[in-house]
């Protein structure tokens, strides 16, 4: 009988161990946090990075600039998915019909978008041969829960990296 103790991992079972990471799908906004993450993932995990940017109708975004920036920073692929119609019909319209609001009338549009973004990330990760998905959510809000729970439910084989949470950095 072996006296060797089983290895214990810290964090949730879906969190990536550096030795398990080969190719990462990064949910990429083009902002400072996710741009730093792109390089950090390449350096820390010695991994290839595929970027995914999801257009849910955010105003003022130039998706060609975002894609170009990701490529200049070393992403091996960069995908921009226009999910506005799907988001409007499958999420927003249903929320309006259900009178889904939070607190004093705050619409839940940001929260509603996270499961769709995670679903699209799973699809793209599989299509691009990624074993891990990275996101820029902090450890403070529920966005990380919405994204990670959706990934775990749809693709338990995929691991998750949450650099902002791991770094324990403030903004």
Question: Could you tell me what each predicted segment is?
Answer:
Residues 2-171:
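ATP-dependent adenylation/nucleotidyltransferase module used to activate substrates
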């Amino acid at each position: 009988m072996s006296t060797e103790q089983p290895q214990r991992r810290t964090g949730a079972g879906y969190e990536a161990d550096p030795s398990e990471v080969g190719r990462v799908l990064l949910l990429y906004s083009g902002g400072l946090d996710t741009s730093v993450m792109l390089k950090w993932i390449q350096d820390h995990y010695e991994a290839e990075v595929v970027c995914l940017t999801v257009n849910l109708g955010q105003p003022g975004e130039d998706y060609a600039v975002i894609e170009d920036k990701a490529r200049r920073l070393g992403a091996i692929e960069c995908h921009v998915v226009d999910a506005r119609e799907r988001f409007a019909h499958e999420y927003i319209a249903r929320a309006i019909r259900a009178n889904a609001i939070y607190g004093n009338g705050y619409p839940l549009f940001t929260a509603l978008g996270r499961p769709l973004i995670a679903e699209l990330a799973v699809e793209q990760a599989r299509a691009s041969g990624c074993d891990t998905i990275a996101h820029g959510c902090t450890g403070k809000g529920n966005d990380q829960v919405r994204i990670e729970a959706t990934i775990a439910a749809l693709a338990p084989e995929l691991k998750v990296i949450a650099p902002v949470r791991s770094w324990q950095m403030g903004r």
